[in-house]
């Protein structure tokens, strides 16, 4: 009887947490993102190019910010968050990523746009407050863009990295699962790593509705659709272990440090996604994984100050794993 009572109480606690998240999460995501700066962060003089890359899948040219690491260099694809803008990638708006990686031997690739996309190939048109468009981001990132970059910029098609924050952290992992030759390295910073489970689909739908008016059903169908499982990193740990993919996972504990991010939305969101990261670590270790960095012990909130610090910290690891030759690219 005691065991049953404990289970009932535990179920009740999960229900209350889920209900609270359903009420607060969409608005908090909007607040945590903060107001974007008017201009990008990269200083004048850096060799940053603004490419218009044709996408047959999406029926338009896609803007891509690009800094070369030299001919034949490996690349780091930096993916944006839920509220990705159409002018600059969030990594350039909020961090000096191009400065940090200048002459690192790594080409830096920042696709622009894709609000609420999860960088996925959607089942249906992505219709939001700004109208409808076609989202075939996985096809773009794994076929159209690498072909363009290999032909026009001398970037390697294989042996690259994908790094994402929040929404796109899980996207980076799934890109590595499904395209292991292209992405031998995946970085996930403050992401929800079990999106298909529990209230995940409902909460993601609410957040997408708040961030542009998009519908999760148009992306992956109802929660029972296999696409949700296909895009759930926690269900693909055996593939990541089998491919020996290099992983870099970060999630703070919701307590701000001297870096900043001391606001309730950023603190709540980091706490909210933390448990999925800890579970992922346990499952990864249990599956025999041995090629990952887990940075879960430090203070940190759901904000760019911490994601930028992680990107800067992982640079030597990226260079070593991808075989970069520092000094290239200008």
Swiss-Prot record:
Subcellular location: Secreted
SUPFAM superfamilies reported for this sequence: alpha/beta-Hydrolases
Catalytic activity line of the entry: 2 alpha,alpha'-trehalose 6-mycolate = alpha,alpha'-trehalose 6,6'-bismycolate + alpha,alpha-trehalose; an acyl-CoA + a 1,2-diacyl-sn-glycerol = a triacyl-sn-glycerol + CoA
Assigned keywords, A-Z: Acyltransferase, Disulfide bond, Secreted, Signal, Transferase
Enzyme class label: transferase
Source domain of life: Bacteria
Chain residues that bind substrate: 82-83, 166, 194, 272-275, 279, 302-304
Active site: residue positions: 166, 270, 302
GO molecular function per UniProt: diacylglycerol O-acyltransferase activity; trehalose O-mycolyltransferase activity
Protein EC: 2.3.1.122, 2.3.1.20
UniProt xrefs under Pfam families: Esterase
Span of the signal peptide: 1-40
Region feature (Fibronectin-binding): 98-108
Disulfide bond sites: 127-132
Coiled-coil parts of chain: none
GO CC terms, sorted: extracellular region
PANTHER family: DIACYLGLYCEROL ACYLTRANSFERASE_MYCOLYLTRANSFERASE AG85A, ENTEROCHELIN ESTERASE-RELATED
UniProt function note: The antigen 85 proteins (FbpA, FbpB, FbpC) are responsible for the high affinity of mycobacteria for fibronectin, a large adhesive glycoprotein, which facilitates the attachment of M.tuberculosis to murine alveolar macrophages (AMs). They also help to maintain the integrity of the cell wall by catalyzing the transfer of mycolic acids to cell wall arabinogalactan and through the synthesis of alpha,alpha-trehalose dimycolate (TDM, cord factor).
Family: Belongs to the mycobacterial A85 antigen family.
Protein name according to UniProt: Diacylglycerol acyltransferase/mycolyltransferase Ag85B
Species this protein is from: Mycobacterium avium
